[in-house]
Swiss-Prot record:
Keywords from the named record: Chloroplast, Hydrolase, Plastid, Protease, Serine protease
Protein name per UniProt: ATP-dependent Clp protease proteolytic subunit
GO cellular component: chloroplast stroma; endopeptidase Clp complex
Family, similarity comment: Belongs to the peptidase S14 family.
Gene, per the UniProt record: clpP
EC number of the protein: 3.4.21.92
A Pfam family the protein falls into: CLP_protease
Catalytic reactions of this protein: Hydrolysis of proteins to small peptides in the presence of ATP and magnesium. alpha-casein is the usual test substrate. In the absence of ATP, only oligopeptides shorter than five residues are hydrolyzed (such as succinyl-Leu-Tyr-|-NHMec, and Leu-Tyr-Leu-|-Tyr-Trp, in which cleavage of the -Tyr-|-Leu- and -Tyr-|-Trp bonds also occurs)
Gene Ontology molecular function: ATP-dependent peptidase activity; ATPase binding; serine-type endopeptidase activity
Organism of origin: Amborella trichopoda
Enzyme class: hydrolase
Length: 202
């Protein structure tokens, strides 16, 4: 029998009695966001909406985005990345478990000096893939042109965010490149590796 989303007590300022809310609702109130699934339209819109809402509520307090994602669709991932650059608060990105494909792209998009990986996290980068291998030739050619533009966009962002030269990023994106937290730090995708009991939550 599925447990469902756990609920925790929450007391609003000025209220005596606590109400039970789902744990993610409670964490969102502390400006903690989660990308814990494949990147697709619905979760992308939720994260973007939360970032915008929390920025309107208080544009001086940092946001924290925890990532454990196998990747997913390119456009929803780019939407999250663009929103992170757009909102006034700094967005910390924290990799726990795996940040692969668009997950690593979002991870790299955090505020520089505020991108972190847990010690046993894994990061993977590669080029965007087509979903139209069995499409008619004309559609495939159009798709290939769009993929090339997306690859150029993703490559330029990695160059900007990691400080690596274009040729290094381009070469790495030719295949699946898996990295440990230490390797991701050396590659410029994250800035810090979490050490037990030394990281302060908001």
């Amino acid at each position: 029998m599925p447990v469902g989303v756990p609920k925790v007590p929450f007391r609003s300022p000025g209220e005596e009695d606590a109400t039970w809310v789902d744990i993610y609702n409670r964490l969102h109130r502390e400006r903690l966001l989660f990308l814990g699934q494949e990147v697709e339209g619905e979760i992308s819109n939720q994260i973007v909406g939360l970032m915008v809402y929390l920025s309107i509520e208080d544009d001086t307090r940092d946001l924290y985005l925890f990532i454990n994602s196998p990747g997913g669709w390119v456009i929803p991932g780019i939407a999250i990345y663009d929103a992170m650059q757009f909102v006034p608060p700094d967005v910390h990105t924290i990799c726990m478990g795996l940040a692969a494909s668009m997950g690593s792209f979002v991870l790299a998009g955090g505020e520089i000096t505020k991108r972190l990986a847990f010690p046993h996290a894994r990061v993977m980068i590669h080029q965007p893939a087509s979903s139209f291998y069995e499409a008619p030739a004309g559609e495939f050619i159009l798709e290939a042109g769009e993929l090339l533009k997306l690859r150029e966009t993703i490559t330029s962002v990695y160059v900007q965010r990691t400080g690596n030269p274009l040729w290094v990023v381009s070469e790495d994106m030719e295949r699946d490149v898996f990295m440990s937290a230490t390797e991701a730090q050396a590659h410029g995708i994250v800035d810090l590796i979490a050490v037990e009991n030394t990281w302060d939550f908001p």
